[in-house]
A protein has these predicted regions:
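Conserved phosphate-chemistry cores used by DNA topoisomerases
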Residues: 1-805
Length: 805
């Protein structure tokens, strides 16, 4: 064999890759920033830069951080801190700002004199953001001068230079455009950013964080500023619950260089919410700070109950679980050198934090109990109630165990089990009512599919105590069918009899209500099933379409539109003004583009008429740059296109430029002036940019009127929405459409084909991405307090589709 052929298999020193500078980050971005496909990594880029501003605030040098999402999907973060150092770095020979931007593990976080504690991650922070951006612009206001540097692809494109004087202003601004080579999309979620920035504003009281989004047609802005810090955070978390005390207990102090801040109170619910943070970073899985807090809480309350004589009088002993029933707490620690169980920082393992939290909590909580005897008695009374309910539940459970032999026979009459005993291969369908249960039992695969019909509405567990819940027949059946047991001491996920639990309810209001009640039950009583990915929601079809003898089942509106477009395009020809004809697959592509554009236009506020937006899109009013180059010319084009689609006696549109560089369109109709305005900020928004990306292909097709011909019928087409409407109408001709409301309307064969057959069905897996939001939503929708529920309905009423009376 020749040497050349052998060479690739040699493993020598030159096979070892040393990834210099930021190359390592671009090679393995997930290690540094998280998932680059699901959006979490993209948002993490913003948090990395924000953390620098927050660290300045923690060090006492800043009180303002502004985050702005620009229309081009770039993001800028500015603060009024000291400004990144701009002097020349002694070792590197370039400005310190450039070293921070272009080298991993460079920064002030490793020098404990600059920052005592910091939230910024492994010293990779802003250099990682630079590495994963197409471009990044840095502005520094320091020493009376404004300095600017630009980086492209992680490398310095323009060295730091002074551009002007800036007086007393100090601070830093970083603006970056994330790279599409790394991230599959650049869609920032305003809600996701707002949630994290709100956490930071609560945890750092006195810091004002402003979030601005310039992408929508009407820009969004929110200011997050909380003087009360974690006390305000606790009130915010419990905004939909009834507190058991007027003000939260607030504890703040320092032990062995570890700063501890705790705010807590009890409410009228039966669930515990503890949110732990270390240096502003949340820990989903708790850690030593939570262990210290829980130990001290139980011990202090026990001591108070003994010393005040309440425990003796009530003759009941309570556990930590009883003490934490209905407790909401935010626990924030500031640790100089924290240790976590993994890179994601979901669990704190620094052993020195536990005694620090425990001793401070013991001392301060005992003081609070002594100083507030009335409230202390109320809290202990609530905990004793929880202990008595736990005792009652234990007795109810023992009773249930004794009845098991009878119950198994009773359950056998309800649960139609499957013959397979391996849980990983089996699934159980929770079906609404006996009629649907009958169809499901007949249509299922008896080897792997079990069916449990639920009669009526199950108990709302949000408002029920544990002992009352156990006495509910339907919940008893459900727990017995799953086999896991229920309650903190009894629940065992290893005993789960089915690895797919599928909620299958009707597509009407009652079905939605029963599904919500079941989700509330699983979220509150068996959250491990959701975390393990065992809970699903079936998607029975919403429509049946018949033509002659053929029948098709369609799961939702989008599937129906697909079907109608397929039917409408068949035999249709779109004749363009240029003489070109579009048919078949090409016509389907044009109609699909019209659907995409409709989705983009639907995101604009409703006071912009859709037909005006449609014609403005064809005229090029949304193309970035073109608008600024010749806005009057664009206004004239839009007016001309509106005249084109108007009846002869309704024409006369005039376009002119407004003061905010928008377009004013007006016509006189029956002696009255009709005015429509496309605002300047809207024409430059992110939504406008998305619309502008369609303009070139729209002009190729609709610049001059087109004609749609199908089966000897023809109609003029003036725009994409016009075409979509015409094709859908053509597709509907000769069809019979049935909308299903109940599963009982289907016979067993239909149910198998559409909903039960693993090869053909669609299942939605239930996941919880944000525990705080989920907790608040269940409390709002299912809790006792009416006002937050009414507000929720008013805010979301207009978004409802398929309202069923």
């Amino acid at each position: 064999m020749s040497e050349d052929a052998q060479a690739p298999q040699e493993y020598g020193a030159d096979s070892i890759k040393v990834l210099k500078g930021l190359e390592a980050v671009r090679k393995r971005p997930g290690m540094y920033i998280g998932d680059t496909d699901d959006g979490s990594g993209l948002h993490h880029m913003v948090y990395e830069v924000v953390d620098n501003g927050i660290d300045e605030a923690l060090a006492g040098h800043a009180d303002h951080v502004t985050v702005k999402i620009h229309a081009d999907s770039s993001v800028s973060v500015s603060d009024n801190g000291r400004g990144i150092p701009v002097d020349i770095h002694p070792e590197e020979g370039v400005s310190a700002a450039e070293v921070i931007m272009t080298q991993l593990h460079a920064g002030g976080k490793f020098d404990s004199n600059s920052y005592k504690v910091s939230g910024g991650l492994h010293g990779v922070g802003v250099s990682v953001v630079n590495a994963l951006s197409d471009w990044l612009e840095l502005r520094v206001w320091r020493n009376g001068k404004e300095h600017v540097a630009r980086f492209e692809g992680g490398e310095t494109a323009e060295h730091l230079k002074v551009v002007q004087e800036c007086g007393d202003r100090t601070g830093t601004e970083v603006r970056f455009l994330a790279s599409t080579d790394t991230f599959s999309n650049l869609e920032y979620s305003f809600e996701t950013l707002e949630k994290r920035l709100r956490e930071l504003a609560f945890l750092n009281s006195g810091v004002r964080i402003i979030l601005i989004d310039e992408r929508p047609a009407e820009r969004l802005e929110t200011e997050l500023f909380y003087e009360g810090g974690v006390k305000e955070f606790v009130k915010y978390l419990d905004r939909s619950k009834t507190p058991a005390m007027p003000e939260p207990i607030y504890i703040k102090g320092e032990r062995d260089d570890i700063g501890v801040e705790i705010a807590m109170w009890w409410n009228d619910s039966y669930h515990e919410t503890v949110l732990p943070f270390t240096n502003n970073i949340p820990q989903r899985d708790g850690g030593t700070h939570v262990a210290g807090f829980r130990g001290a809480l139980t011990r202090t309350i026990n001591n108070y109950a003994q010393s005040s004589g309440i425990a003796k009088k009530e003759k009941v002993s309570f556990t930590g679980d009883d003490a934490r029933e209905g407790l909401t707490c935010v626990l924030s620690v500031k640790v100089p050198d924290p240790k976590f169980s993994s890179q994601t920082k979901d669990k704190l393992v620094s052993s020195e934090v536990r005694p620090a939290v425990e001793s401070l909590m013991n001392e301060k909580l005992a003081e609070w109990f002594e100083e507030n005897p009335n409230e202390a008695k109320g809290i202990v009374g609530k905990i004793i109630e929880a202990a008595l309910a736990r005792e009652a539940a234990r007795k109810a459970r023992e009773l249930t165990r004794r009845k098991t032999a009878m119950d198994v026979n009773y359950l056998a009459g309800k649960l139609k089990d499957c013959s397979e005993k391996d849980p990983s291969k089996t699934e159980v369908f929770l079906v609404e009512g006996d009629s649907a249960g009958g169809s499901a039992q007949t249509g299922r695969d008896r080897l792997t599919q079990a069916v449990l019909p639920l009669r009526g509405k199950i108990l709302n567990v949000e408002r029920a105590r544990f002992d009352r819940m156990l006495s509910s027949q339907e919940i008893g059946n459900l727990v017995m069918a799953l086999g896991t047991g229920i309650g903190r001491d009894e629940f065992n996920i290893e005993k789960l009899r089915y690895h797919k639990i599928v909620i299958m309810t009707d597509a009407d209001v009652d079905g939605a209500h029963i599904r919500t009640l079941l989700l509330t039950f699983f979220y509150r009583q068996m959250p491990e099933l959701i975390e393990g990915g065992y809970l699903y929601i079936a998607q029975p079809p919403l429509y049946k379409v018949s033509r002659g003898k053929s029948e098709v089942y369609l799961k939702d509106q989008a599937a129906l539109d697909d079907y109608l477009i397929h039917q409408g395009v068949e035999g249709a020809v779109l004749k363009l003004g240029s003489g070109e004809e579009i048919v078949g697959q090409d016509l389907t592509r044009v109609v699909d583009e019209a659907r995409q554009l409709k989705r983009v236009l639907d995101a604009f506020p409703t006071h912009y008429p859709r037909h005006i937006l449609e014609q403005a899109a064809v005229a090029g009013a949304f193309v970035p740059g073109a608008v600024d180059a010749d806005l009057q010319g664009v206004a004239d084009k839009v007016a001309a296109r509106l005249d084109l689609i108007a009846l002869e006696y309704e024409r006369g549109w005039q376009g002119r430029v407004t003061q905010d560089h928008g377009i004013r369109l007006a016509r006189i109709l029956r002696g009255v002036e009709e005015v429509r305005t496309l605002d300047g900020p809207m024409l430059r928004s992110g939504e406008a940019r998305k619309t502008g990306s369609f303009t070139q292909s729209l002009q190729e097709i609709y610049n001059t009127p087109a004609t749609l011909v199908r089966r000897d019928r023809s109609q003029d087409i003036h725009g994409p929405l016009d075409l979509l409407r015409a094709i859908l109408e053509e597709g509907e001709k000769g069809l019979s459409l049935q909308r299903y409301k109940g599963l009982g309307e289907m016979n067993p064969d239909q149910l198998w084909e559409t909903t039960l057959d693993p090869d053909a069905r669609t299942l939605l897996q239930v996941r919880v991405d944000d525990m705080v939001e989920a907790d608040d939503l269940f409390t709002k929708l299912m809790g006792d307090v009416v006002e937050p529920r009414r507000e929720f309905i008013q805010q979301n009423a207009l978004s409802v589709e398929n309202l069923d009376f």
